[in-house]
A protein has these predicted regions:
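The feature captures the beta-strand-to-loop junction immediately N-terminal to the Walker
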Residues: 36-38
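Helical segment within the ABC ATPase nucleotide-binding domain
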Residues: 187-200
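Conserved beta-strand-loop-alpha-helix hinge in the C-terminal portion
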Residues: 225, 229-252
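Conserved structural motif at the start of ABC-family nucleotide-binding domains
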Residues: 5-7, 20-22
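ABC ATPase NBD Q-loop/coupling interface
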Residues: 62-78, 149
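Walker B catalytic motif
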Residues: 174-178, 185
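ABC-family P-loop ATPase nucleotide-binding domains
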Residues: 91-171
């Protein structure tokens, strides 16, 4: 049986405001899915909910990983089980080298029963694999000696996330706006890198609002999110249509979701004004 990450009728609130309103999606290993939609439609909320961010309250619905209840797992256990999220805005960790961070993260994922203080992956083995992955992704060796995201450009942050994904080898990877803030060349490089480390063993959900990141990652399925729900699913041609024509047809076809989208945007502006 093919392994899968299955989301069923998922409802999520943030600060008591409903964001996701019944999301259904199943991602199987070896598949690439694109989740597209206007800004503020709830795309990133789905990624955070999958990984168990405490600020995102799941009010109903389920997420299962190969039939197991993912929502019953702590966030670190979800990562150990093979689920990975590349953040839209990853945090910096001054004083912690990329190589040290990756060695700890890789050890914890590959040895899920390891306790704090127990030995890490042997240094020689780790360095060999890290060197191979960095060469594959065309990343300068000096990168591993820098502090995690400290002073990184937007492109460097995204490459650090992709390198982490390459080392952890998750079963399922959620890439949240990996193309955000990148120029055309950086997006193309990120797209190529994702394609190189994905393959038949990894299910990938690419969260984006345009199709540039899909240049080397043709989606098996394209989902459109509007007003906190997936309103339409198609193939790669749907992603191309959205890139060329925008979301006017989608809003006209799903007026209830469009009204919810407008309300969500108004609520978002009110929260920003208060903050």
């Amino acid at each position: 049986m093919t392994e899968s990450l299955k989301i069923t009728d998922l409802h999520v609130s943030v600060a008591d405001k409903p964001i996701l309103r019944g999301v259904n999606l199943e991602l199987r290993r070896g598949e690439t899915h694109a989740l597209m939609g206007p800004n503020g439609s709830g795309k990133s909320t789905l990624g955070y909910a999958i990984m168990g961010h405490p600020g995102y309250e799941i009010t109903s619905g389920s997420i299962t990983l190969n039939g197991q209840d993912l929502l019953a797992m702590e966030p670190n256990d979800r990562a150990k089980a093979g689920v990975f999220l590349a953040f839209q805005r990853p945090m910096s960790i001054p004083g912690v080298k990329v190589s040290d961070f990756l060695r700890h993260a890789t050890t914890n994922v590959r040895r899920p029963d390891r306790k704090e203080g127990e030995e890490l992956i042997p240094m020689r083995e780790f360095r060999k694999e890290l060197k191979e992955k960095m060469e594959q992704l065309r990343i300068d060796p000096e990168f591993a000696r820098r502090y995690v995201n400290d002073g990184f450009s937007g492109g460097e942050m995204k490459r650090a996330e992709i390198l982490q994904m390459a080392m952890l080898r998750p079963k399922f990877a959620i890439l949240d706006e990996t193309d955000s803030g990148l120029d055309v060349d950086a997006v193309r490089l990120a797209s190529q890198s994702i394609a190189e480390i994905g393959g038949a063993e990894m299910g990938i959900l690419i969260i984006t609002h345009h199709d540039k990141l899909l240049e080397h990652n043709t989606p098996d399925y394209t989902h459109v999110m509007l007003g906190g729900r997936i309103v339409e699913t198609g193939g790669p041609e749907l992603a191309a249509e959205l890139h060329q024509r925008g979301y006017d047809r989608i809003r006209a076809a799903y007026p209830e979701a469009a009204a919810e989208e407008a309300a969500m945007q108004r609520d978002g502006k009110k929260l920003q004004a208060v903050g």
